[in-house]
């Protein structure tokens, strides 16, 4: 985990910040794609697909011939919606205060504001945050919020990098109001699943739903990895020096990280916990 942080903090994040102005690459999650088997995704699919995705592209994307603009980040939007849809008040989420822990560059915050305009507020916390008025630099183990302030803690594909997940769960329980929710998705070794669920329970979080969404993530990776592979081919030489590490980070087919998912060593899960 230490080396993951070093790579993210000093190599991957600076590269993403530099390249986002050229490529429009702001998300760092693997992506999610509804399949025929995921029939309960219809509400979420309709919500995403009716958005004018062009309006979210606040940077000029140089290589527009790779995909249409409306497809660029759709798998990433789907993953955010997949986490939020576990909440009982989805999709309105009216008046609720949301904290996105591990929010990266804040594109998920921007998306959530657009498609859920009736929320009370949304802010982010990230240890490697770029300058953004909606994001507070902070550590998931010590959230910079007072107790009982938040209705929803949103945690998308971030907790596997934490040194102490149980401490993160305790912090969620602290900042969440009574009956507030932690909406969570992440990639885990299957051998870790029982431990993670037990840690959340010990922290005072009651599990209301747990689901394996690995097939949808693999379908998402097919789309996101194809896009990023195309961008890497056209990237500056200094970026291509890190191609192997970058491809492993976004789990491109043919990498060891993708193989761990496809052969079942790792799974991808969505869960919602209620704060007691």
Question: Where in this protein do the model-derived segments appear?
Answer:
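Class I SAM-dependent methyltransferase SAM/SAH-binding core
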Residues: 99-142
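Conserved Class I S-adenosyl-L-methionine
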Residues: 215-274
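A short SAM/SAH-binding and catalytic strip from SAM-dependent methyltransferases
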Residues: 152-164
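N-terminal auxiliary segments of SAM/dcSAM-dependent transferases
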Residues: 1-42
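A short glycine-rich, Lys/Arg-flanked "PGG" loop and its adjoining helix->strand segment in the class I
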Residues: 166-178
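A short acidic, Gly/Pro-enriched loop at the edge of an enzyme's catalytic core
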Residues: 141-153
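Conserved alpha-helix/loop element of class I SAM-dependent methyltransferases that forms part
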Residues: 73-94
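Conserved beta-strand signature within the Rossmann-like core of class I S-adenosyl-L-methionine
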Residues: 180-186
């Amino acid at each position: 985990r230490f080396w993951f942080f070093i790579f993210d903090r000093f190599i991957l994040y600076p590269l993403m910040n530099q390249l986002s102005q050229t490529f429009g690459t702001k998300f760092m999650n693997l992506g999610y794609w509804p399949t025929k088997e995921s029939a309960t995704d219809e509400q979420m699919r309709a919500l995403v697909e009716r958005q004018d995705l062009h309006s979210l592209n606040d940077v000029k994307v140089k290589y527009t011939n790779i995909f249409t603009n409306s497809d660029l980040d759709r798998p990433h939007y789907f993953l955010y919606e997949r986490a939020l849809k576990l909440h009982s008040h989805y999709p309105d989420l009216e008046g609720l205060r949301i904290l996105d822990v591990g929010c990266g560059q804040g594109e998920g915050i921007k998306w959530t504001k657009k498609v859920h305009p009736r929320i009370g507020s949304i802010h982010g916390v990230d240890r490697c945050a770029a300058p953004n008025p909606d994001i507070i630099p902070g550590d998931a183990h010590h959230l910079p919020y007072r107790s009982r302030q938040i209705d929803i803690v949103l945690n998308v594909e971030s907790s596997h990098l934490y040194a102490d997940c149980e401490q993160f769960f305790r912090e969620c329980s602290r900042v969440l109001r009574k009956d507030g929710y932690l909406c969570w998705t992440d990639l885990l070794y299957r051998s870790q699943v029982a431990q993670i669920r037990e840690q959340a329970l010990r922290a005072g979080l009651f599990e209301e739903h747990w689901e394996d969404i690995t097939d949808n993530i693999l379908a998402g990776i097919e789309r996101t990895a194809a896009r990023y592979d195309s961008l890497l081919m056209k990237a500056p030489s200094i970026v291509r020096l890190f191609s192997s590490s970058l491809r492993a980070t976004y789990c491109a087919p043919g990498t060891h990280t993708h193989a761990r998912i496809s052969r079942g060593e790792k799974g991808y899960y969505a869960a919602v916990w209620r704060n007691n």
